[in-house]
Amino acid sequence: MYKKILIRYGELVLKGKNRTTFIKQLGSNIKEILNTEYEMEFDRMYIPYSEENLKNLKYVFGISSFSPVIETNKNLEDIQSAITKLINKNASTFKIAARRNDKSFELNSDQLNNLLGGFVLKNSHLKVNVKNPDQIFNIEIRKNSVYVFDKSINGIGGIPVGISGKVLHLISGGFDSPVAAYLLMKRGFKVDFLTFVTPPQTDETTIDKIKNLTKVLSRYQKESNLYVCDFSLISSYIEFTEFKSFKIILMRRSFYRIASELAKQNEILMISNGENLAQVASQTNESMAVIGSSIKNEILRPLLTYDKNEIINLSKVIETHDISILKSKEACELFAPKNPVTKPTEAKTLRIESKLDELKTYEEIVLNQKMKKFAI
């Protein structure tokens, strides 16, 4: 019955001079994620109808809504025939919503509403209710075809992945960082991932968990990378510092310096993470400022103001929850001190780092010799 799926751009039509670029990126993403061709018009796109395409459109950012449509010719009998195919036996009331985009068509929208409404009244059990109908028959008169449909499915909104460039995202096995990655994609970032492990304390189970999380997230983008960094050389070195309360601050500053160099190698400008204000000791205002001061890159924190319940609920929506809830050994948790500093200063942190003579050398070794890359 259905021949095509009509896709509406939503936010993209508001982007002025960048509009064409946004829509081309959306088309490219649809082609990659759904492995299908598309037809593009000013305010919408069409792809071939299939149940698989209908299901997978929920993974494409930049779509306001979409509808499976019957495509028919520009004559009244064919339009009536299409409406007949859509009549729902469980509905009691209906409304006709005609839209004449092609002004050369002989009937205007009001005339179409009246004629087609009369047809449905005469040829079905349905009664008219324009305020709260059970079923709405939408008829769009376009230049080359007429499209008839009775449902509109919400897309996930946002803007197309890739339009905002790339970001290197620090991911762990918890709830927060996968959700943060999703939100970055929603604002047009293509995301590469970096995770830190400390074998033998963290084993292959932990790495597999991270890989599985990135695979779920890869439904929203194609051809990204996961970098797995063996951080054990540095974690062992920092473990024996006399300033025990600063261990996590020192580790995370080291994380960011390594991430910054990796981003530079891959021509990525920004670093991101799943940090949430005041959730743990390293996420106080002072801690984040000191950790962030270790690099010049902009650090994006999409979850900064989210409640934990909001994060968990979103993880269920994007289907990372059931992976994140599995037990694993995270680097920061394994080496967290009993009494971590919550209000560090940059001056004191720099004094401590100045006493760690081998830290810079170890960071270079880890970056160049202890990094594995996986295509997702």
UniProtKB/Swiss-Prot annotation:
Record gene name: thiI
Q: Which GO terms describe its molecular function?
A: ATP binding; CCA tRNA nucleotidyltransferase activity; tRNA binding; tRNA-uracil-4 sulfurtransferase activity
What organism does the record attribute this protein to?
Answer: Mycoplasmopsis synoviae (strain 53) (Mycoplasma synoviae)
Which SMART domains would you find in this protein's record? THUMP (SM00981)
Instruction: Please list the GO biological process terms of this entry.
Output: thiamine biosynthetic process; thiamine diphosphate biosynthetic process; thiazole biosynthetic process; tRNA 4-thiouridine biosynthesis
Classification via Gene3D superfamilies: 3.30.2130.30, HUPs
THUMP domain span: 51-152
Function of the molecule = Catalyzes the ATP-dependent transfer of a sulfur to tRNA to produce 4-thiouridine in position 8 of tRNAs, which functions as a near-UV photosensor. Also catalyzes the transfer of sulfur to the sulfur carrier protein ThiS, forming ThiS-thiocarboxylate. This is a step in the synthesis of thiazole, in the thiamine biosynthesis pathway. The sulfur is donated as persulfide by IscS.
What name does this protein carry? Answer: Probable tRNA sulfurtransferase
Q: Which residues bind ATP?
A: 170-171, 195-196, 252, 274, 283
The primary site where this protein sits is: cytoplasm
Q: Which CDD domains match?
A: PPase_ThiI, THUMP_ThiI
Q: Which InterPro entries match?
A: Rossmann-like_a/b/a_fold, ThiI_AANH, ThiI_fer, ThiI_N, THUMP_dom, THUMP_ThiI, tRNA_STrfase, tRNA_sulfurtransferase_ThiI
Ribosomal protein found in the keyword field: no
NCBIfam families, from UniProt?
tRNA uracil 4-sulfurtransferase ThiI
Which pathway does it take part in? Cofactor biosynthesis; thiamine diphosphate biosynthesis
Q: What is its EC number?
A: 2.8.1.4
What the entry lists under Pfam families is as follows: ThiI (PF02568), ThiI_fer (PF22025), THUMP (PF02926)
Record's subcellular location: Cytoplasm
Q: Which GO terms describe its cellular component?
A: cytosol
Under SUPFAM superfamilies, the record lists:
Adenine nucleotide alpha hydrolases-like, THUMP domain-like
Q: Which UniProt keywords apply?
A: ATP-binding, Cytoplasm, Nucleotide-binding, RNA-binding, Thiamine biosynthesis, Transferase, tRNA-binding
Instruction: Specify whether Transmembrane is a keyword of the entry.
Output: no
Q: So which domain of life are we looking at?
A: Bacteria
EC top class, in one word? Answer: transferase
